[in-house]
């Protein structure tokens, strides 16, 4: 258990500094370029752990698995993380960190509609508390950054959809989170590279500039990388994306999925504090109220998950006991 808590601590630290590290180099890299580089590096760092998980499992790539990884990678890296990168450009790192952490809350209704998972009263309470917290942070009465808020929420919603895709893939193909992430990150990085190369075609680049999408025109791949930006790039690729997810999955192995999810429940509180000290981003009263409500909602959901897991274990134990009694009665009858 102690080892699991250490893994959670490191994963929380890396994930909580993600938006801050990106903000520090936002002016040195194109958002799409940085997205491509950090997930490519992250997939390489995750690969040894994924290979270890696949040993002796009889896993083999076929057309359906390749298509699945291409789809999940596209949803995560190309769609969700592009919204995420752009959100950090247009909004404060602390705001993006808090709103993006709500992706776990958006999973609740998606799981109900797409996975037919039961929607409990506690889940509804968690969802309501987190939504009110988001409204406090957004502050509709003084909404001055519509673009940044919208991009942050789009990143959270699409990442929640990626989580649902991951669950469906796990149920269908039987691989775990580390394999899912490693292959999806690699597939998504290659897809993003292809799109980046397309933006370099002259007529495509000219059209993107003419419609006001200059950030998506002629996107660099390696250009602009300097000695001053290399440490931040290594931190984002190796530590945040690679080791952050590695420690998260190792925490799952050492504890449980619900305990490991504490990473995303602590982040909304820790990230703004780190942003205050590193970037000087002030925590206003409405943001503080939003953090408290989101943390409350997250705690309710964690309690709900633990309660549901205990009920399932009791049901399984009851079924096994009933089966054992039935077998004993049959043997006695004979």
Predicted regions mapped to residue ranges:
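Loop-to-transmembrane-helix transition segments
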Residues: 3-11, 58-83, 147-155, 207-243
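Transmembrane alpha-helices of multi-pass small-molecule transport proteins
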Residues: 28-79, 106-107, 158-165, 181-203, ...
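Helix-helix packing/entry segments at the starts of transmembrane helices
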Residues: 37, 95-102, 166-190, 237-277
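C-terminal-most transmembrane helix of multi-pass membrane proteins
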Residues: 39, 50, 229, 261, ...
């Amino acid at each position: 258990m102690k080892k699991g808590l250490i893994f959670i601590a490191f994963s929380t630290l890396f994930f909580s500094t993600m938006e801050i590290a990106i903000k520090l180099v936002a002016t040195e890299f194109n958002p799409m370029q940085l997205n491509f580089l950090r997930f490519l590096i992250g997939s390489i760092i995750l690969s040894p752990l994924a290979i270890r998980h696949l040993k002796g499992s009889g896993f083999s790539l076929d057309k359906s698995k390749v298509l699945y990884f291409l789809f999940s990678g596209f949803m995560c890296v190309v769609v969700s993380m592009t919204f995420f990168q752009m959100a950090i450009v247009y909004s404060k790192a602390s705001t993006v960190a808090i709103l993006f952490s709500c992706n776990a809350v958006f999973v609740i209704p998606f799981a109900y509609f797409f996975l037919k998972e039961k929607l409990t009263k506690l889940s509804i309470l968690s969802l309501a508390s987190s939504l009110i917290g988001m409204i406090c942070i957004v502050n509709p009465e003084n909404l001055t950054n519509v673009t940044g808020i919208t991009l942050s929420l789009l990143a959270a919603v699409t990442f929640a959809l990626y989580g649902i895709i991951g669950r469906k893939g796990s149920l269908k193909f039987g691989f775990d989170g580390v394999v899912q992430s490693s292959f999806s990150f690699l597939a998504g990085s290659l897809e993003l590279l292809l799109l980046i190369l397309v933006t370099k075609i002259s007529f495509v680049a000219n059209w993107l500039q003419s419609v006001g999408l200059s950030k998506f025109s002629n996107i660099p791949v390696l250009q602009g990388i300097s000695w001053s930006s290399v440490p931040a790039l290594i931190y984002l690729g190796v530590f945040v994306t690679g080791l952050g997810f590695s420690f998260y999955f190792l925490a799952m192995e050492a504890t449980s999925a619900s305990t490991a999810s504490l990473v995303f429940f602590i982040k909304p509180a820790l990230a703004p504090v780190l942003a205050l000290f590193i970037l000087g981003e002030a925590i206003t009263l409405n943001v503080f109220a939003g953090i408290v409500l989101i943390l409350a909602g997250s705690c309710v959901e964690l309690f709900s998950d633990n309660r549901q897991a205990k009920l399932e274990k009791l049901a399984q134990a009851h079924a096994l006991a009933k089966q054992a009694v039935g077998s004993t009665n049959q043997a006695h009858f004979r």
